[in-house]
Each structure stands twice: as C-alpha cells, then as structure tokens.
Regions:
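Interdomain "pre-motor" coupling segment immediately N-terminal to P-loop NTPase/helicase cores
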Residues: 97-155
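Noncatalytic partner-interaction/assembly domains of nucleic-acid and motor enzyme complexes
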Residues: 1-119
Length: 155
C-alpha cells in the first residue's frame, strides 16, 4: 500500500478505483488485441490502481508495439518474464479470470474512461493532501494559492 493510500485510509477515506473496469480493460485487450491502440490513447500503466494491472497493461502495450501476437500464451510469457506474478500458475489463474469476466469487448472505451476518471480523482486527492501539508509549513497565502493552482494544473 502506498503512502497516499495510508494517509487517506487513516482518515477513513478509500482511494477511488474500479477493479472491475481495470480487469475489463485488460480482458478485452487480451481477447482482442486490436483494441490496444484505442486504449493507449487514453491510458498509461500508472492509471491503474492495482500494480499488477498496470504491469499487465504495460506488457500488452509492449507486445503490441513490438508487433507480437496478443494471445494468452504471449501475454502469459511476458508477465511471467516481467515478474508481475510470483509464479506462472498464479499468472495463468489471473489472466484466465480476466478473459472470462469481460462483460463486453465492445464497451472497452467506456471501461477505459472509468479507469482514467478514477485515476484523475486519485490525483486530485494527492494534490489536496500536498496542499494541506504545505499550508502547515507556508504562511503566505499568495504562495499557497500559486502552488495549489500549479498542482491542479499539472493534473
């Protein structure tokens, strides 16, 4: 669990994410690799809340841009080689689950939008945390406002 998660968990607030949407994006890409260019326009690995989902996405993109076939075997080999999972069996179970639980491949852009929106909210929460911490250290309101504007603008 990262520092941001711990901070908000201590306040009784959970960081927003949709595991279903993350897994639907990955499952759709696994089943129909030609949707990857559409996904790359919207998502990056760091947009995924679950570390392993981001790593799987990175491998899918790497395979696709390298001209490799996107199928169960190539993706399995890639994520095992990348160390995303502790064992090959663990990777097989997870990837099989992704492929079996995709609600609809045709909705992959919608799922990608959900993943991206949750990421943006997490980024806003991180900026809010930074701004709050800075207010305890910086008494000058103009400096605080400028810093806060910059943090929001960067998102």
């Amino acid at each position: 669990m990262d520092n941001l998660s711990l901070t908000f968990e201590n306040m009784g607030v959970r960081l927003p994410y949709s595991m279903d949407a993350e897994q639907a994006v990955l499952g759709a890409a696994l089943l129909q690799g030609d949707c990857i260019p559409t996904l790359v326009e919207k998502l990056r690995p760091e947009h995924f809340f679950a570390r392993q989902n981001g790593e799987i996405f990175a491998e899918l993109v790497r395979l696709f841009t390298g001209g490799a076939a996107i199928d169960f075997v190539t993706v399995l080999n890639a994520v095992v080689s990348a160390g995303t999972f502790a064992t090959s069996d663990e990777a097989k179970v997870y990837l099989t689950g992704l492929a079996e639980t995709v609600p609809s491949i045709s909705n992959v852009e919608y799922y990608a939008n959900i993943v991206y929106e949750k990421y943006l909210v997490r980024q806003l929460m991180a900026a809010a945390k930074d701004i709050l911490e800075q207010t305890a250290e910086e008494p000058d309101a103009d400096i605080l406002l400028e810093s806060a504007e910059q943090k929001i603008y960067e998102i």
